[in-house]
A protein has these predicted regions:
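Thiotemplate assembly-line natural product biosynthesis machinery
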Residues: 1-21, 71-74
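Phosphopantetheine carrier-protein modules
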Residues: 14-32, 48-60
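Short, cationic-aromatic polyanion-contact patches
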Residues: 63-71
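Two-component histidine kinase catalytic core, primarily the HATPase_c
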Residues: 37
Length: 75
C-alpha cells in the first residue's frame, strides 16, 4: 500500500468513526458512509491533498478504489 492509500484509509477511519476500514470499503458495506459523512470525506480529502473536487467527482466516490483513482487523476 502506498502512502496516499494509507492516508485515505486514515481519513476514512476518522470520518466514518470506524477503525476496521479496509480497501474493500464502499457505500454499500459501510453503514456509517451516509450523505453527510460523504461530504465530510470529500472536504477532508480536499484539505489533505490540497485540491478542489468537482461535484461530479464527489458523487463518483462510492468506494475506496474510486477515491484512489480520482485522487490519482488529480495529483
Amino acid at each position: 500500500m502506498n502512502p496516499m492509500e494509507e492516508k485515505v484509509l486514515e481519513i476514512m477511519r476518522e470520518v466514518f468513526g470506524v477503525e476496521d476500514v479496509t480497501t474493500d470499503v464502499s457505500q454499500k458495506n459501510c453503514e456509517q458512509w451516509d450523505s453527510l459523512r460523504h461530504l465530510a470525506l470529500a472536504s477532508e480529502l480536499e484539505d489533505a491533498f490540497n485540491l478542489e473536487l468537482e461535484p461530479e467527482e464527489i458523487a463518483e466516490m462510492t468506494d475506496f478504489s474510486r477515491v484512489i483513482a480520482m485522487l490519482e487523476s488529480k495529483l
